[in-house]
Amino acid sequence: MYQDLIRNELNEAAETLANFLKDDANIHAIQRAAVLLADSFKAGGKVLSCGNGGSHCDAMHFAEELTGRYRENRPGYPAIAISDVSHISCVGNDFGFNDIFSRYVEAVGREGDVLLGISTSGNSANVIKAIAAAREKGMKVITLTGKDGGKMAGTADIEIRVPHFGYADRIQEIHIKVIHILIQLIEKEMVK
């Protein structure tokens, strides 16, 4: 009944991944991002991650696998997803939704820390404000974006972009693969 739809969905996902994989710049950006994050941890820094909707879940997943574990047991790494409901509701109510991430970065971000901003469109105003706040603090910035990078294009030290112009879920599927690879590479870098 739905077999053709299932095949089409899986084929489109495979094609999106294949297109991303063809561009060596993506491979180099992932490697550079992992080294940047590990270097920050080694120097006593931390990573803050943020995004909206599914990207918010990815930001939380990224932090959880760093503080918890990925595939093997090892020490936890300093990672915080900006996801505290009381913070988000307070700042959203008192200042506005566009400030929910930047206020947190202003409060706890330090020079030498890293911000991971995730947006499939690259146009999330609250992530863009978080990037500006991170810059004010002297933090490094890594972004996971999609399509043409949107307004976030060119704002990061390292941008990892999935140039897919269809639905956001295809971009998110690549983002989670990138997140898992970043964690794997960070773990390798941390034991060097």
Swiss-Prot record:
Residues that hold Zn(2+) according to the record: H61, E65, Q172, H180
Gene Ontology BP terms: D-glycero-D-manno-heptose 7-phosphate biosynthetic process; lipopolysaccharide core region biosynthetic process; protein homotetramerization
PROSITE patterns cross-referenced by the UniProt entry: SIS (PS51464)
Tree of life domain: Bacteria
E.C. code: 5.3.1.28
Cofactor: Zn(2+)
Pfam family, one: SIS_2
Residues noted as binding substrate in the record, renumbered to the chain: G54, S55, H61, E65, N93, D94, S119, T120, S121, S124, D169, Q172, H180
Cofactor note: Binds 1 zinc ion per subunit.
Domain SIS residues, every copy: 37-192
Outcome when changing R69Q: Almost no effect
Record's keyword annotation contains Transcription regulation: no
Subcellular location, principal: cytoplasm
Keyword Zinc (UniProt): yes
Pathway, per record: Carbohydrate biosynthesis; D-glycero-D-manno-heptose 7-phosphate biosynthesis; D-glycero-alpha-D-manno-heptose 7-phosphate and D-glycero-beta-D-manno-heptose 7-phosphate from sedoheptulose 7-phosphate: step 1/1; Bacterial outer membrane biogenesis; LPS core biosynthesis
Subcellular location: Cytoplasm
Effect of mutating H61Q: Almost no effect
A cellular component term, taken from the record's GO annotations: cytosol
First-tier enzyme category under EC: isomerase
Gene Ontology molecular function, alphabetical: carbohydrate derivative binding; D-sedoheptulose 7-phosphate isomerase activity; identical protein binding; zinc ion binding
Further remark: The reaction produces a racemic mixture of D-glycero-alpha-D-manno-heptose 7-phosphate and D-glycero-beta-D-manno-heptose 7-phosphate.
Protein family according to the UniProt entry: Belongs to the SIS family. GmhA subfamily.
Function description: Catalyzes the isomerization of sedoheptulose 7-phosphate in D-glycero-D-manno-heptose 7-phosphate.
Subunit structure: Homotetramer.
Entries under HAMAP family matching the protein: GmhA
Protein name as annotated: Phosphoheptose isomerase
Lineage: Bacteria, Pseudomonadati, Pseudomonadota, Gammaproteobacteria, Enterobacterales
